[in-house]
Amino acid sequence: MKGQKTNLGESHGGWLNREIKLFGLFLTLISLSNLIFSNNTLALYTPTLSASVDQTNLQVDGNQVIDSADQTTEIPLNLIVNTNNRTGYTATLNSKTDETALVNTESATGAKIDSIDANKTLAGFSDNTWGVKVGSNTNFSPIPKPTAPMNVMQTAGKTNGNESNQLSIGMKLSDNLESGRYTNKLVFSILTNDYNQIAMMTEGPDFNTKLKSLEPPTSEINYFRKSPVPPATSMNAVNIEDEESDYEIKLWLDPTDKTAYYYTETEKVYLNSDSSKMFYSDLYEQKIRNVLEMDLSNFDTSKVTNMSSMFLGMVNLTTLNLSNFNTSQVTNMGGMFGFMSNLTSLNLISFDTSQVTNMAAMFFNIVLLTTLDLSNFNTSQVTNMSNMFNNMASLTTLDLSSFDTSNVTDMRYMLSSMRNLTTLDLSNFNTSQVTNMNGMFSLPDMWASNDKLEKIYVNNDFNTSKLTTFSNIFSNRKKLRGGNGSYLTDPSTADKSWLRVDRPGVHGYFTKKS
């Protein structure tokens, strides 16, 4: 990273004498821009910075100030900045030297107009002092030295054209001021904030469209990984970077090894905030349905908020390792792994789900997965868990005792069609906000003969105070028994009163966890 320094020049001050009392203030502007120079053609973005002040030479008629009622004056000036730097800029102000007074260089006695010594209003100035303030602040500040510059403005993003920052010079004079020329120099420094250039992926649906466009009827994509080298011109690569990306990202299919490669200069690629449907394969199309292996280790997901349907329909993928995924900003994981019908290994150990509100159909129809560890999941913000585990046909046990469901409103078919499930631990479920439990534990008629669920463990009765929709909650769960042995011959007729711990005098389909 290299700096670019621009000095916009200096102007000359005025005169202060017994006949016409003036002071002159010189303003120097230095702008510093962190610019990145690259020999590579894939760099798309270079930060720029320009700055100016509307007055570089301020002059005040001292006689007019002294003759005024309060012997004070306030002179406005504007610092104007324009930058496309995506992390903004910082502007500071200080005197050019450690001398902060306006100095009469011709005075034999060393006459000065001193800086104020503390923050104060203009009315509180002592005679023959001056200060500076930023924006709409009420108080003026002492003139800052180079060793402790004043922060004028600090932004976090690019400007929308020219951005004006208002300042004011304040002064109080008295008629005992010695005649002469009083001058000083103030320096504005404008520095673009540090910015690390990144490769940013296009939005998920757009990536999906471009990935599918690479797969002709005569070939298929079996693998997806990063290439160490750019594509050959014969590969007909497509661009998959976001418009805000600093680098190009190329995507192409090599038919010789049936691999979809991507390439960019940087080691890692930031996924778009909307990464929904990135590898989505529609149930009625053949595009990218034959992917067998994906290397996603160079993806940085720290900026992603939407991962809904991200891998939905990847029916031939057997292993998915997402241990490098940072999901701390994600709010939507609905359908994320739905219909991955051949998946047998899923690593979600790194998942931070503390911001997720939607987990509907997240694991829907993953029929071959035999174990699922979600003990690290924070579900405190989730409102929708409908169909979350629907048709996870190979799970025999599921421990959801760590789930915080205090904000969930929809649990319909959440645990439906789990035909090999024998026990279920819901010991910390809070259902006080749930309105819909339709078919929550049900089995479809076609799998009724495969019913294996025997125990559902809870700590307390379900809170059904807001439950309005609850048909077929236990449909076809004929092996299920409450802790005291209660059951119905036709479980489909169970109403919400069966969402209780079974005990003497109280029927229910739940068993209290010891």
Please annotate each region the language model reported:
Residues 1-44:
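Sec-dependent, cleavable N-terminal signal peptides
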Residues 3, 102-104, 262:
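Short conserved micro-motifs at the rims of enzyme active sites and ligand-binding pockets
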Residues 10, 14, 91, 177, ...:
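Intrinsically disordered, low-complexity segments of exported/surface proteins
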Residues 20-24, 77-88, 158-162, 248-258, ...:
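Short, surface-exposed loop and linker segments with low hydrophobicity and enrichment for Pro/Ser/Thr
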Residues 34, 70, 82, 158-160, ...:
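Sterically constrained small-residue positions within well-ordered secondary structures
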Residues 42-196:
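Signature of Gram-negative chaperone-usher
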Residues 195-514:
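Negatively charged
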